[in-house]
Amino acid sequence: MYLGTKSRFQEEETVVKLIIGARGSGKTKNLIEQVNAAAAATKGSVICVEYGNTLNFDVTYKARLVDTTAFGIESADALYGFIAGLAASDHDITDIFVDAALKICKYDMAGVESVVSRVRKLSDTYGFNFVMTVSAPIEDCSEEMRSLV
């Protein structure tokens, strides 16, 4: 059975990480710093998925910035399908970042948890790092999500 190929630029184990916190706690700023650092360090592709068009001037041109509203992504299943499509279409992806995941998933925490669970498997198969911000109190998150902070 074909399970995909890992990025030829990925030299170490993949990382799946969440940045969780209340609104205004600096999650997006942290994500922007990580996107720009990854884009500067990698020879592969870095993708940043966002809700709306707010990060245009903050994210380096070396990273591909994708607005979910332009593609009609309004649910957890749509977000996962989009990420899977990115991974399937570009085998040089080393990092995928998602900002405002809870907003993209229409504030469905169970849906966000489902995306995290499925992307962990996808990340191992295709060999990319994954970082996502979630605007919620950490107490509202599952144990699986807390373990990825």
Predicted segments with their positions:
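Conserved P-loop
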Residues: 12-87, 141-144
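Short, Lys/Arg-enriched N-terminal segments with co-localized hydrophobic residues
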Residues: 1-14
